[in-house]
């Protein structure tokens, strides 16, 4: 029972944080998370979601929570693509889309390599590392 409560609390607090990030991004016409952190996070969410869907721990509750996280990550990603270009130096604005897609691909490759190389508990630690990077 305690694990269920902790999962619900963790899931709920991250959903609140992500929702605030999206709200602030739209309201301030900006984005609320460093982009490379977002790239790593969305990559981790997709890989972990795949694990949860394919019979990993957590059951239905974790599938629902992770699904919502993935959707909210997509919302933050949308705010980046809507408003991020204005923060690029003028000389680099023409590279915004290409460089952004490149970062997403690199983050997915990094997370996939980590995910396929290390045991499951190390993968969870990767999530904690991403949280640290997002907090900087």
Question: Across the structure, where does each feature detected by a protein language model lie?
Answer:
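Alpha-helical membrane-protein topology signature
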Residues: 1-136
């Amino acid at each position: 029972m305690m694990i269920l409560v902790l999962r619900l609390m963790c899931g709920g607090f991250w959903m609140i944080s992500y929702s605030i990030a999206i709200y602030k991004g739209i309201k301030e016409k900006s984005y609320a998370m460093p982009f490379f952190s977002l790239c790593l996070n969305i990559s981790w969410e997709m890989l972990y979601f795949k694990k949860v869907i394919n019979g990993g721990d957590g059951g239905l509750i974790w599938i629902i929570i992770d699904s919502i996280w993935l959707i909210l990550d997509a919302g933050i990603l949308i705010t980046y693509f809507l408003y991020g270009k204005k923060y690029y130096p003028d000389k680099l604005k023409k590279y915004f889309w290409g460089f952004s897609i490149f970062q997403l691909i690199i983050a997915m490759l990094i997370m996939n390599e980590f995910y396929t190389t290390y045991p499951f508990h190390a993968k969870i630690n990767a999530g904690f590392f991403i949280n640290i990077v997002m907090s900087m």
